[in-house]
Amino acid sequence: MKKIKYGIIGAGTMAREHILNISLIDNAEVVALADPHKDSLNQCKEILKTEVSYFTNHLEMIKENNVDVYLISTPNFTHIQILKDVIKTKKHILVEKPLCTNTKDCLEIKNLTKGYPSVFWLSLIHISEPTRPTP
């Protein structure tokens, strides 16, 4: 079975959690990581056990075009611009909550993803876990 290739944008605490969780899935792997802060990239390098491409700009990762899923785990205020860039790829997208920091930006993303040909998923803690009731 072909492995699902993840490109993670943002190398902070949540990205490290995602790296650990993705490593538990047999048919998934992190193949690319982008963050403007080299210290954050280095912390992720310590836990990644596979060959990964590292970038200091998410646009470089997009240009390489080597991922199946973009996972956006950056500071909240950066989501809108990164989403605009990643949506153009038509690849699968998982973005950490909140989607954006204001209603205007959320509505813009809603409009940009109407009819989106791939999965667009907003990560909401516990809502996607079958063992927890939906609030």
Where are these regions (language model features)?
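N-terminal Rossmann-like dinucleotide-binding module
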Residues: 1-49
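Beta-loop-alpha module in the N-terminal Rossmann-like domain of NAD(P)-dependent dehydrogenases
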Residues: 18, 52-112
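Acidic-histidine catalytic/liganding microenvironments
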Residues: 25, 48, 64-65, 116
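Short, well-ordered coil/turn segments that N-cap beta-strands
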Residues: 28, 52, 91, 118-120
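Short, Asp-centered acidic motifs that coordinate Mg2+ and/or phosphate
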Residues: 32, 69, 119
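Conserved acidic E/D residue at the C-terminus of a beta-strand in Rossmann-like folds
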Residues: 34-35, 96-97, 129
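Rossmann-fold dehydrogenase core element
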Residues: 108-125
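Single conserved hydrophobic/aromatic residue that forms the stacking wall/gate
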Residues: 125-135
